[in-house]
Each structure stands twice: as structure tokens, then as C-alpha cells.
Amino acid sequence: MRETVLEAVLRSADAPSEAQRNRFAAFLKKQYGQEVPLRWEQDPALEKGFRMEVGADLYDWSLEGRLRQFRERLEQLNPAGVSVIPLMREAVRNWQPDAAPEEVGSVLTVGDEIATVSGLEHAAYGEILQFSSGVKGMVQDLRPDRVGCILFGGSEAIESGSIVRRTGKTAGIPVGDGFLGRVVDALGMPIDGQGDIPSEGYLPIESPAPGIIDRQPVNAPMETGLLAIDSMFPIGRGQRELISGDRQTGKTAIALDTVLNQKGKGVVCIYVAIGQKSSSVAQLVENLKHKGAMDYTIVVNAPASASASLQYIAPYAGTALGEYFMRKGRDVLIVYDDLSKHAVAYRTLSLLLERSPGREAYPGDVFYLHSRLLERSAHLSEELGGGSMTALPIVETQAGDVSAYIPTNIISITDGQIFLESSLFFSGQRPAVNVGLSVSRVGGDAQTKAMKKAAGALRLDLAQYREMEVFTQFSSDLDETTKRQLIYGQGLMRLLRQPQNHPYQQHQQVILLVAALDHVMQTVPLARMDDFRTRLLTYIETQDQALCRRIDESGQLSDEDRETILKLSREFLTRFQTEAAEKSGE
């Protein structure tokens, strides 16, 4: 094997003496195991100290270099509530400049949030690079003669030929309880104008997903407060449930209602906005504040105006924040809104890095892009604290095409999907859940016994109604049984309509399901169904508070409680019909 030919270039204001040259030669032979020729170049700017370059290694013994080393040493101090002054004194007293080399490279090209760098032979994938302008980048492309990196700041100050340094670190984000109630960017920096956030540590944005032994089955419900979902497609803590649908079909509304429903339940919520309008995110934050939900929520925002690099790392940063709380034994709900824009940002970066395009111009590893993200959501074993992270990824479809590339990828990764249909949405059926295409694969085990007993054959009844509705379009002559079934199905569909920002408690869902599936509401006109539903809940909550409390606390529905609900429902129905008759008589 041929020995690598090296040359050392020494730069300083004054020429080295013969004794100094001998010391440099001895140092280089010890460091590289061979004789390294030394060439001196004058640099008037280096009045105090010197710089020596050997291949890609830089020994920076200038005043600027030593000050930078000292600053980095101070930045490593982590007082965690302890006075930093004694630590600084000790650091100053014990500090010695490091004689180890830095691996430096130079910028070849820069533009479109991408920089190519030569000379960094040992740079690792995902490593953070420091540019001389102060901008940081992350290595995303490794070639024999250069590396490609994405930039986390403006590229205007970066010039071709400028110096780039390795940091030896991967991208990370500060974490801590202080992030609750705050809005941060993809790097964990506050953007809500409320000052700095005290951090309790630093976690890498990319980390391995928990293994099989580290997990336990999904066995606790993550209630959304939405009757259509909790009854037929229940979500468990630690599950990944996709929310899919066209533009303006209520995808974000479902996720936000789920966040609002966690109030008082000890769940930490993280909302990751990817490529959204800043005005929409600001309105969302105001809504959460108004409802008192920001106290337990963190918003990570990489808006449409942010670079593709920040949009790419945003969901990983949000997941790292979630993992901090999950490892402390907390339950976490994380919403990714939305992963379609995340995939587009990654496609943009990949094409700029000159990677080979595949289907729909996405790179070949776009499946891994989302699988490594969503696999980090889990219900941890009791040995690891028993915490959980539930993921609600949102994906936008085009003209209801569920078979497109990104939707099918994420369907195969997640534990179920809630598919929203435009025709249902615009007909007033909101949430516009398509009962036939939606499914929850593991949440059924987490559903409370009360909900399971109350929901009964709801999904089957709705499927029969939808099928019958199609056939009745071709026939006007219907028998009485068919008419009754159609009226019953229409009543169920009307019952599942729910206004935004009004999640139901568990006992309210149980009451409505028990009454509806026993045909108590069969005679209520559709136009008055909303009024009947609201007043029925108020009536039963007033008449039997102990019943409601019992269902909420135990998650059980005894036969006696079921009969009580039916008895009170029929009592109220009689009263409701009497009032309606009196009004019509007037």
C-alpha cells in the first residue's frame, strides 16, 4: 500500500527558528508516523501564535484559535441551578490549550440551502459542521472527494473557499419542563417573544426506536373526545394513527380536539407544524391559550417561510422533546401536521444534493424517512418507566387518492388510519370520517369496557345503512322495515356530527351511544337531533351525577347503569315530544 504523501504548511508573522523547526519536525513525526516536510508561509495577521495545516488537519495555535477553544470550554459548563462563578474560576485555572488537530475543509459551492465541502475525509453522516460565518450545517451526502450538507441558516455570508470545521456532534435539541406552554423553532429556540427557555439537558434529534423488549402492549385509551372515533376507531396510548384526507376536510381539527380533550389528564401534547402558514399557527396557538390547553402543550413550528432544512428536521426535534417526557414516565401525544410537506421538503433537499430520484421524484429512502420517525412512538415497559408517546401523523391526499406514494407508505407504518372524505365534509357530516376505509388495528384493546359495551354494533349498523342508501337511489318503492332502517341510519349519522372544540367526556359518549343504539332517538326529527342530544346530556347529568362519575372513574358500564340510562332517556324523550307538541299546537 502506498504511503500517503503529506506536507505541513506553517503560517505565522515571523519565521520559526531552527530549534523551533526541529521541534515541529519531531512533533509531526510522532503524530503521523513519518517524516513530514515543513513549509513556512508568512501571515502578518498572526502576530501572536501560528497555524499549521497538515492535509485536512489544522493546528490552530493563534490567539483567535485559543480563545475559541476557551469559549467552547465555558459553553460546556452545565450549572443546572448551581452558581456558575466557581465553575468558571476552576475552568480558567485548569484550562490548557488543546494541541489536538482540528479537521477543517473548505467550501466548494454554496446555494439553495446546500453547501458542498472538500477536505473533511472523516466527516460522518448527520454530523454538524461549523462554517466560518457562524452558520451551522448537517452532513447529508458523503462522496469520495466531498461532502454535501444542508444549512440551518442563510447562505449569503458563506463564500466559496471559506473554512468549515467539524464539531464531532450530531444535531440535537435542548429539552426540559420549561418548554411546556412555549412555541419554538426546529432548533428548539423560542419564537414566541417570551424570553429564553431554561433547559435541563440536550437530546439528539435522531435516536434509535425502542426495541421489542423495551415495549409493552397498547392497553390504555388516548381519548379524542370525538364520538365517531372513540366509538369505532379507538386510539391507545403508544399507538400511531394516521389522519388522512384532502385539503380542508378537518384533519387538523381532529388533532386539535384530541389535544383539547387531554386537559386535566396529565398528557403532554406536542404539535409540530411543518410548512404551515405562520398566521394559521398563530391562530392555533391563540385557540389553545383560550381553551387553557397551552399549559400542557409545546408547539414546534417550521413554517412555509422556513428553509427546507428546518422543515426536514422539525418532526425529529419534536419527537426528541416527546422522548424526554416519555422517559420520565409521562404520557405524550404528538401531532405531525403534516408529513406530506415533510416529504416534499426532503425531496427538495435530496434533488439539490443530486440524489437519484425515484417514484414521484422522491428519493429511494423516503419510506425510511418516516418509518424511523414513527417507530419512536411506543408504550415503554414498566422497567423503563411505563411512559408512552402516541403519534397522530397527518397526510394530505389529492382528490381522495389513498393509493398515492406517501399515504400508502405511512399507512403501512402506522397502526391504523382515519380517512376523511370531502363529500361527507361538505354535506355537513363533521368530523367527515369514512367508516369503510378507516380502521384502528391495536386501539380496540385499549378501549374501556364501558365504551366497548355501549358502542356495540354501531359500525355494522352504519355499514348496512350506507349500503342500503346506495340501493335506495334506484328504487322509490320501499317497505316499512327498510324505511325504518334508513331513518335509524340517518339518525346515527346525525348523532356522530360534533362541533369543533367541543370534545365529549366518556360518560357523555356512553349515554349517547346507549340511547341511540336502543332506538330511543328513532322518532326524533333530524332537524331537532342536535337540540335533543344537548338537552338529553344535561338532563341525565342533572338527574344522576353519581352514574356519570362512576362511568368516568371506573370505565365500566354495568347492566344496572345501562338500564338507568335508557329509563332516563325515555323519560326525557317523552318530555321533549310533549314540549314539541305544545309548541306546534300554539
Predicted regions and their residues:
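Elongated, mostly alpha-helical coiled-coil "stalk/stator" tethers of large membrane protein machines
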Residues: 1-82, 123
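Phosphate-interacting basic helix/loop segments used at nucleotide- and nucleic-acid interfaces
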Residues: 32-36, 86-95, 225-229, 318, ...
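Short, charged, intrinsically disordered terminal tails
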Residues: 66-91, 574-586
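N-terminal accessory targeting/assembly segments
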Residues: 80-182, 187-191
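P-loop NTPase nucleotide-binding/switch module
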Residues: 162-164, 171, 175-178, 191-239, ...
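Conserved P-loop NTPase nucleotide-binding/switch module
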Residues: 247-274, 278-280, 290-292, 308-419
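Conserved catalytic/coupling modules of large nucleotide/cofactor-utilizing molecular machines
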Residues: 341, 351-586
